[in-house]
């Protein structure tokens, strides 16, 4: 099954690095030089890192958001893994509700939803724009201007 090469999470509010680090290490990640790595016996590896957007990124993204973006989380999926890989289950089992999971391995979307639920402020709203099948990364917009239902309908 296809797994996207990565995601970008964008939020209008700063993400607390300590909360990000604590979430990652509590869920089996290894923290090193502001990057978190998860390795699976299947050979799949996920790397996530937190940055402040550059001026150009902020200028590019601001028109889509009600305020300039403050934090960006890049998530890179290094390898493919099948959806029946049991090694994924303990780490990334999480609430998965209304994701548009066409062509995506649902375990990766569960992992991303856990990141959003546990690290970002709960009132931030998700807008998710999947990439073409052969391209990436996907975009996950986090913007309080939209309600959850409106966001999914856009």
Identify the role of each PLM range:
Residues 20-31, 65, 92-99:
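Hydrophobic, Leu/Ile/Phe/Ala-enriched alpha-helical segments that form helix-helix packing faces
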Residues 31-42, 103-110:
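A generic structural motif
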Residues 84-90:
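Well-ordered, non-membrane alpha-helical segments in soluble/globular domains
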Residues 39-69:
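Short, solvent-exposed beta-alpha or beta-beta edge segments that form flexible loop/patches at the rim
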Residues 1-37, 148-154:
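Short, extreme N-terminal segment that most often corresponds to the first beta-strand
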Residues 1-4, 90-154:
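Acidic, proline/glycine-rich low-complexity IDRs
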Residues 79-83:
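Conserved aromatic-histidine-acidic binding/catalytic patches
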């Amino acid at each position: 099954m296809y797994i996207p090469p990565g995601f970008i999470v964008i939020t209008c509010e700063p993400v607390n690095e300590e909360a990000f680090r604590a979430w990652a290490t509590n869920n089996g990640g290894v923290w090193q030089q502001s990057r978190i790595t998860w390795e699976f016996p299947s050979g799949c590896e996920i790397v996530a890192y937190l940055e402040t957007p550059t001026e150009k990124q902020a200028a590019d993204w601001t028109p889509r958001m009600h305020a300039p973006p403050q934090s960006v989380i890049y998530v890179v999926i290094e390898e493919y893994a099948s959806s029946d890989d049991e090694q994924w289950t303990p780490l990334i089992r999480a609430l998965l509700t209304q994701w548009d999971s066409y062509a995506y391995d649902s375990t990766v979307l569960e992992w991303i939803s856990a990141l959003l639920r546990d690290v970002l402020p709960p009132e931030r709203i998700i807008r998710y724009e999947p990439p073409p099948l052969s391209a990436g990364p996907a975009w996950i917009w986090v913007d309080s201007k939209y309600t959850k239902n409106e966001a999914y309908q856009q």
